[in-house]
UniProtKB/Swiss-Prot annotation:
Binding site for substrate: 21-23, 36, 59-62, 119, 159
Disulfide bonds: none
Classification lineage: Bacteria, Bacillati, Bacillota, Bacilli, Lactobacillales
Cellular localization per UniProt: Cytoplasm
Catalytic activity, reaction form: (2R)-3-phosphoglycerate + ATP = (2R)-3-phospho-glyceroyl phosphate + ADP
A Pfam family of this chain: PGK
GO biological process, one term: gluconeogenesis
GO molecular function: ADP binding; ATP binding; phosphoglycerate kinase activity
Chain segments annotated as transmembrane: none
Gene: pgk
Organism: Lactobacillus helveticus (strain DPC 4571)
Predominant localisation class: cytoplasm
Protein name: Phosphoglycerate kinase
Subunit structure, as described in the record: Monomer.
EC number: 2.7.2.3
Length: 403
């Protein structure tokens, strides 16, 4: 069912509450990466260019104490947003009370207001975590500030918080509209089509440290994928399940039986490394050696080897849909990044396929290579995109009205 989208709304003269994802890295008041702010611009611009008043809510980081509040204020984000929009943005250093209500009442059509970090509500009270615990009274209060609600925060779509599900529930309860923003719409389109209606051959590439993080994804995508290519630390649990020697490699001993089950269920769909780049210690300076699918006792696998890269590329060259989540090795160390970077290059060369990247390290690899413009879609949600690939219902999407 198609969701109600921001451009289905008549925003002129209306106060539009927008849950954005401004959870960006900030150190000493300086934003390290503004991609999430940039990703929210189309929705914000639509509202203000059509005469709406945009009231923006977001969390930033994990707020555990008053000491965190200085580092986790959204003030620098509001300043950066003002630069990107090339117009003034009002920052309100609170998200509840008279100061907030006055700022909103003083808005003119086309104005933008950013309220303070929603997670300050997790410590500013005697009621426990009001925001991340989805306190209905907080959701109702925030909903009372606007005429309609737009959820554009895919990064928190797998969570039921007061600032997404709480507001949407209260809005709908009052006969008001709750719609998806353009970013949420894009995520639903690309991830939804890949999971539910992929063009074949459909290749899933999974990496990262733990099998346990990806069990749901593998189970959901075995019947849908033509191939599931596995690299990263999780590959060694699968290799151990096949009876290979894995030396000192990272693996989950308690998941070996599960890996065997997944291998049996998948048949020949799961493709594992046939060689590995190994070292005696987890260090960029350690001497490297290419070994087969058995790793010597004194060594650990830290990247996929050249034969595996060639094998994976050969499978990818015919793909029409590709979803990649997780690095192929210890990507943070340049000497063990080649597998991840080569997979990124292979995806960039697929001109006749839909390519989707999710997860922090895979996304970082795409940026490092400068291939982002050649990728169909880079997901803005780590946990949310994994949950979506598992086939789970995401509360932040479910709370938005259908057309």
């Amino acid at each position: 069912m198609a969701k109600l989208i921001v451009d289905d709304l008549d925003v002129k003269g209306k106060k539009v509450l927008v849950r954005v994802d401004f959870n960006v890295p900030i150190k000493d008041g300086v934003i390290g990466d503004d991609n999430r702010i940039v990703a929210a611009l189309p929705t914000i611009k639509y509202i203000i260019e059509h005469g709406g008043k945009a009231i923006l809510l977001s969390h930033l980081g994990r707020v555990k104490s008053d000491a965190d509040k200085k580092e986790l204020s959204l003030k620098p984000v509001a300043e950066r947003l003002s630069e990107l929009l090339k117009k003034p943005v009002t920052f309100v250093p609170s998200n509840e009370g008279k100061e907030v209500e006055d700022a909103i009442n003083n808005m003119k059509d086309g104005d933008v207001v950013v309220l303070e970090n929603t997670r300050f509500q997790d410590i500013d009270n005697d009621f426990g975590k009001r925001e991340s615990g989805n306190d209905p009274k907080l959701g109702e209060y925030w909903a009372s500030l606007g005429d309609m609600f737009v959820n554009d925060a895919f990064g928190t779509a797998h969570r039921s918080h007061a600032s997404n599900v709480g507001i949407a529930t209260a809005m709908k309860g009052n006969g008001k509209l709750a719609a998806a923003g353009y970013l949420l719409e894009k995520e639903i389109k690309y991830l939804g089509d890949a999971v539910d209606n992929p063009v074949h051959p459909f290749v899933t590439i999974l990496g990262g440290a733990k099998v346990s993080d990806k069990i749901g994804v593998i189970n959901n995508l075995i019947p849908k994928s033509d191939h599931i290519l596995i690299g990263g630390g999780m590959a060694y649990t699968f290799l151990a399940a096949q009876g290979h020697e894995i030396g000192k490699s990272l693996f989950e001993a308690d998941k070996v039986d599960l890996a065997k089950e997944l291998l049996e269920k998948a048949g020949d769909k799961i493709v594992l490394p046939v060689d590995n780049v190994a070292a005696t210690e987890f260090s960029n300076d350690a001497s490297r050696e290419v070994v087969g699918d058995d790793i010597p006792d004194n060594m650990m696998g830290l990247d996929i080897g050249p034969k595996t890269i060639a094998k994976f590329k050969d499978i990818l060259k015919d793909a029409k849909t590709v979803v990649w989540n997780g690095p192929m090795g210890a990507f943070e160390m340049p000497n063990f990044a080649e597998g991840t970077l080569e997979i990124g290059r292979a995806l960039a060369n697929l001109t006749d396929a839909t390519t989707i990247i999710g997860g922090g390290d895979s996304t970082a690899a795409a940026k490092q290579l400068g291939i982002a413009p050649k990728i169909s879609h880079i997901s803005t949600g780590g946990g949310a995109s994994l949950n979506y690939l598992e086939g789970k219902v995401l509360p932040g999407i479910a709370c938005v009205q259908d057309k």
